[in-house]
Amino acid sequence: MDIIPPRLKEPAYRIYEMRLRHELVRSKAQLPRHIAVLCDGNRRWARDAGYDDVSIGYRKGAAKIAEMLRWCQAAGIEMATIYLLSTENLQRDPDELTALIEIITDVVEEICAPYNKWSVRTVGDLELLGDEPARRLREAVESTTTKGANFHVNVAVAYGGRQEIVDAVRSLLSKELANGATAEQLIEAVTVDGISENLYTSGQPDPDLVIRTSGEQRLSGFLLWQSAYSEMWFTEAYWPAFRRVDFLRALRDYTARHRRFGK
């Protein structure tokens, strides 16, 4: 039961948000360097809000992405990976999928805008989206630069965690074959480091914290290799309703954990 009167909710959340920020500052705890987010629950948000057109939920969720990235940047986080479209999502209704891909393309172009000064990389198989969306996404990402960027963004589109590992192994073996490796040398080349160096996220730190909205408590194939020792944080909030208060709670919970990395 909601005990806070509607007219007092916004002021109450602002006070709570301020308190969380002060807690993080006072704790002097180490914040995550890299946050990964599964932006889930757009369709359910739209249906619960009474909309028949689920693309309204996608649009609402898209508007939240740049906002959340600015929260990360303001907190001093160096990198964020956002999961926007899985390979499984490509099986959705064609009309819904067309609208979703257009929305994703628009939001990536927004993220890549010069005024953000962010370095952006896509992870996934853009060819699965069709020629025009793939072209627009490549052009947008290529317009960003790592030079002078103090915040880096990965956008997971047409991404599958299992496929990424398969692609990494294939890439590793192809390079070894090109160098004339024997069968025995190929077997020896398949190592943890060798696979890591051929992932879509090669050269980047693994995520310290993985956030998933919508109440679902699973990775759904997201960064399977990279998230081996990531901390997980789940919230019931649908992505369009995800607030800065929720984000700060995730950071607070992260700083209270002791990361053992399997030791």
Swiss-Prot record:
Q: How is the cofactor bound?
A: Binds 2 magnesium ions per subunit.
Q: Where in the cell is it found?
A: Cell membrane
Provide the active-site residues from the annotation: D40, N89 (proton acceptor)
Tell me its EC number(s), please.
2.5.1.68
Q: Which cofactor does it need?
A: Mg(2+)
From the UniProt annotation, give the residues forming the signal peptide.
Answer: none
InterPro entries documented for this protein: UPP_synth-like, UPP_synth-like_CS, UPP_synth-like_sf
The UniProt similarity line reads: Belongs to the UPP synthase family. Z-FPP synthase subfamily.
Function description:
Catalyzes the condensation of only one isopentenyl pyrophosphate (IPP) unit in the cis configuration to E-geranyl diphosphate (E-GPP) generating the 15 carbon product (2Z,6E)-farnesyl diphosphate (Z-FPP or EZ-FPP). Z-FPP is the precursor of decaprenyl diphosphate, which has a central role in the biosynthesis of the mycobacterial cell wall.
UniProt subunit comment: Homodimer.
Q: What is this protein called?
A: (2Z,6E)-farnesyl diphosphate synthase
Lineage start: Bacteria, Bacillati, Actinomycetota, Actinomycetes, Mycobacteriales
Gene that encodes it: uppS
